[in-house]
Amino acid sequence: MKELPAYLYQIPYSLLNYEKFRYKMHPFRILKASVFLLILYFLFRIFLYSVFFEKAVQVVVSTQEEPIPILQETHTFIHSVYYYPVSKSLGQNAIAMVTTMNKRTVPTITDLTINMIGTNRTARWKKEATLTTEHLLNDRCDYLLITAQTNLLENMRTLEIEAEGVMMEIPFKKAKYHAPKPVVFCVSPQFAAEQWQTFLVQYHISKRYGAHLQLYIVSMVESYYKLISEYEKLGLVSVEPWLTIKFSETDGPFLEPNRNVELRNQAAAHTDCLLMYKEAVSFVGVLDMDDILIPNNAESYYEEFEREYSGSWIISALSYGKLDFHTIKVAGLEDQSISAIVKNARRLPTKDTGKSFFRPERMNSTWSHYSRNSDKQPIYLAPTQSEPFYMERKIVKYNGMFHLKKMDWVNLTDVRDGSIPVNPGDNITQLISEAHLAEIDSDLRRMLSMEQISQLSSTLPKDDYYMPIVFKCYNESFYHIRDTAFLYNDITCVNAFSCELPQRDDLPCIHSDATYHSGPKMWPITYHYASDAFFSSDIGCYQ
């Protein structure tokens, strides 16, 4: 029988003859080798991990587990808490809380978190709220604006703060989702306010160009307040009492907050206003009562702001410089003329720190001049973007704020016709057109002719009493330091709470007040808040 070639033999693959064909590529041998190589691979990965990353892992773990050292027990005042069912920048069911907090509670106050508990009809959630501030952490002022933010439940009914098992319920309110106009101006808290002419200029010019005024008042001459109240009754302005910080119940000494916070914590008032309107308007501005903004080559603030943003995603805010002007004022309410105030204005050689106007979805808090949290923040516009852009303020070059720095009393017979000054930004165009000025004056006369307003004329201040006192105190406290370029934030806390304001019986004032509440003692922070705010005629013109 002829012998067949060896390569034609059928090779029986089985475990029984595995040894017989030891150098062949047997499937079981392939499987065994693969398992062996996988084991080697994972052992090698473990070896590399232990050699090169062990120390880094130990550092991360120790950092996470190490508690934040508590420096002292402190007190915090809660100004407001807002709830957002939906927010463009805060997300769904968001909570934002505005506080004045002692930064020396821990080494770095923004490292601290607050436990918040939200409850609705069916659930109860506990989450940590993160803290941010608009102030510099090396500021000399011990108390700062601190904003706490987290996201909780839909249809939330109650909100509590918790620390080591101790809980405190705090009131909250829903943010606005509708506003009278697409632009809102947040006016700094007024105290010992008596120059009512600035309100008339601010309101009627802002109205012409499409902004709603949100006012905050600490104290004010009573007749001036009554004038503003008539505008408020007509829905033309909104007014909020800005409260003096008080800790109604404490079990030991504490650092007095009003003397150790920057300028009555104006930043907290501006942040409160931003959070109140952030879902309701297209633009928010922060300014003082005597900061007048007039659009340049635009019919409205909205038109100018949209033009300046130009669709950019990296502009955090529009910054307008403040140019100082010296002008006149007259005593009679029926004799008021914004045309006369504008046409008799003369530019002073000085200027002041500018103010900002911004899209509210681009920031969740603000300082008195701009948002330090939003400026220079990284932003990614596409998933494929490897390096971020950085948000920054845009300095508006062709417009500036008409700052009513100084207003002198004059007799009506001494008012000159004058002429419209040039725009303080470009120094070429007119500050305002004759047609717009005539339109504003017509609206002013219409309002002042209303019986409920015209009857206030005899009661309004006809001389300056508080303004010179406040200016002198401010100058002695910090203006002269600032003007000589020696005002450093880590050396001087810009505060004038110690200013002495002598009261006059013939010049009664209203002052903000409320029912103050203190929560249970908590570690390391005990919380305080106020409810049912109102204006009292029994306190006087104080800060």
Please tell me what each predicted stretch does.
Residues 2-12, 16, 20-174, 263, ...:
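Catalytic-site signature of metal-activated, phosphate-bearing donor transferases
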Residues 157-159, 165, 220-230:
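Carboxylate/His-rich catalytic cores and anion/metal-binding grooves
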Residues 174-186, 191, 195, 223-286, ...:
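Active-site-proximal specificity loops/subdomain of glycosyltransferases
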Residues 195-203:
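Short, acidic/polar
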Residues 202-212:
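Short, acidic, metal-binding catalytic loop of nucleotide-sugar glycosyltransferases
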Residues 211-220, 239-243:
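Short beta-strand/loop segment that forms part of the nucleotide-sugar
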Residues 288-290:
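Short acidic donor-binding/metal-coordinating loop in glycosyltransferase active sites
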